[in-house]
A protein has these predicted regions:
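P-loop NTPase motor module signature
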Residues: 1-192
């Protein structure tokens, strides 16, 4: 090689967390939810309306899944078989932006999800104390945490106690519109 044989080799042993991916259709079916059904998209609905509608439907589906996770049998069907019963089972939700985080938080409040979970937003506009609160696992809490954040947290933050992740599969990207000569955030599907 370029540096000869003197290049030190470093091995960092890590224990990966077992991950199981479940599509929304599978989760809805397993939960036997009657609150939510997936509707076909119309080819005639304008794209911007489709995004807004999809975001609303995704929020409703998220609330349905959060409620269903309180059922022990349903929860067990989603977890790896070797998960200990005493393990915290907090939920991390990835939403596309701050407005969607706030909308989902309000929907959780309206649907009574906050009786089951401590619903905690996590984004850059919050002060340090609010961010710290979302990232700290309470020692003696009967409730699970549901931390709602943007995909920025995927690579920069570890949220302890999380066993379930709900990802809308959406992100916001800055896009320049030459017609209006302005830049705006466009919600689009993530590539992964």
């Amino acid at each position: 090689g370029f540096f000869g044989d003197r290049t030190p080799h470093l091995h960092v042993g890590t224990r990966p967390y077992p991950v199981r991916v479940h599509d929304l259709e599978e989760v809805i079916q397993k939960s036997r939810s009657t609150e939510f059904r997936i509707e076909p998209w119309s080819e005639y609905v304008p794209k911007d309306t489709q995004n807004a509608r999809f975001e609303r439907e995704a929020s409703r589906a998220c609330v349905s899944v959060l409620k269903a996770l309180m059922d022990a049998d349903f929860e067990a069907s989603l977890l790896p078989p070797d998960t200990e019963a005493s393990t915290r089972k907090d939920v991390l939700v990835f939403a596309p932006g701050v407005a969607e985080i706030e909308e989902l938080e309000n929907l959780c409040r309206k649907e009574g999800v906050q009786r089951l979970y401590d619903v905690l937003p996590l984004h850059g506009a919050l002060d340090d104390e609010q961010q710290r609160h979302a990232l700290t696992t309470p020692e003696h809490s009967e409730k699970r945490r549901c931390v709602i954040t943007t995909n920025v947290a995927e690579s920069s933050v570890t949220v302890p106690g999380v066993r379930f992740v709900i990802d809308f599969g959406l992100e916001k990207l800055p896009v320049y519109d030459p017609r209006t000569r302005t830049q705006a955030l466009l919600t689009r599907h993530c590539s992964r």
